[in-house]
């Protein structure tokens, strides 16, 4: 009973901190050149499903114009929820929070602007042990990501993409098996 109350109190504090961080960052994001809200869903090995809510900031930095395409950088902040459907799950509900700078190679103009992207960010997890036989070692994780997608619409307000994400603690602590997510995401840009 005491352990359950402690978990509930920790979860409540985690959610309050995430809401406060989003509220505190809102003015900075709102004054940016362009920002967006992203929702994603994904699946991973070890019977884990992931729901993700993100905020993206595009400072409109461009360089290396090549054949109608150019490079750009986008900053993203994420809060995610993992759900393990494994019967042996010790912590079936895990929260993740983190940031990722993303480099894109994107079409420079058009109603539909395809891109490829890659990024390396950091994440913090609420729990490190998912089942008795699977643990990610530490709450601190690196998040490597590659993906494809497109920005579209008359005002370039919409974005959709597919990403492959690998989380690992980079050998900081054992065990370090890593975990791989395949994710679909949608974004609305303001």
Where would I find each of the regions flagged by the language model?
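Outer-membrane beta-barrel "beta-signal"
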Residues: 51-55, 178-190
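Cleavable N-terminal export/targeting peptides
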Residues: 1-32
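Transmembrane beta-barrel strands of outer-membrane/channel proteins
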Residues: 37-43, 75-81, 116-122, 162-166
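Residue-level signature of outer-membrane beta-barrel architecture
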Residues: 41-43, 57-59, 105-107, 150-152, ...
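Solvent-exposed loop/turn segments connecting transmembrane beta-strands
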Residues: 42-51, 88, 110, 171-177
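Membrane-spanning beta-strands of outer-membrane beta-barrel proteins
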Residues: 48-50, 96, 141-143, 179-181
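Extracellular loop and loop/strand-boundary signature of outer-membrane beta-barrel proteins
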Residues: 40-41, 86-90, 130-136, 169-174
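Short loop/turn motifs that connect adjacent beta-strands in outer-membrane beta-barrel proteins
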Residues: 29-34, 60-71, 106-114, 154-157
């Amino acid at each position: 009973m005491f352990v359950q109350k402690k978990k509930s109190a920790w979860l409540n504090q985690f959610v309050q901190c995430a809401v406060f961080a989003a509220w505190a960052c809102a003015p900075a994001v709102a004054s940016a050149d362009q920002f967006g809200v992203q929702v994603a869903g994904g699946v991973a090995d070890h019977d884990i499903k992931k729901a993700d809510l993100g905020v993206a900031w595009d400072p409109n930095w461009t360089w290396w114009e090549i054949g109608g395409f150019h490079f750009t950088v986008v900053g993203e902040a994420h809060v995610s929820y993992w759900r393990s459907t494994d019967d042996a799950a010790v912590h079936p509900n895990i929260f993740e929070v983190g940031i990722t700078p993303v480099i894109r190679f994107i079409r420079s103009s058009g109603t539909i602007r395809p891109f490829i992207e890659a990024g390396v960010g950091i994440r913090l997890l609420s729990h490190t042990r998912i089942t008795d036989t699977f643990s990610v070692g530490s709450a601190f994780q690196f998040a490597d990501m590659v993906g494809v997608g497109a920005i579209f619409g008359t005002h370039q307000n919409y974005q959709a993409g597919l990403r492959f994400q690998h989380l690992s603690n980079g050998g900081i602590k054992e065990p370090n098996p890593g975990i791989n997510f395949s994710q679909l995401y949608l974004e609305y840009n303001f």
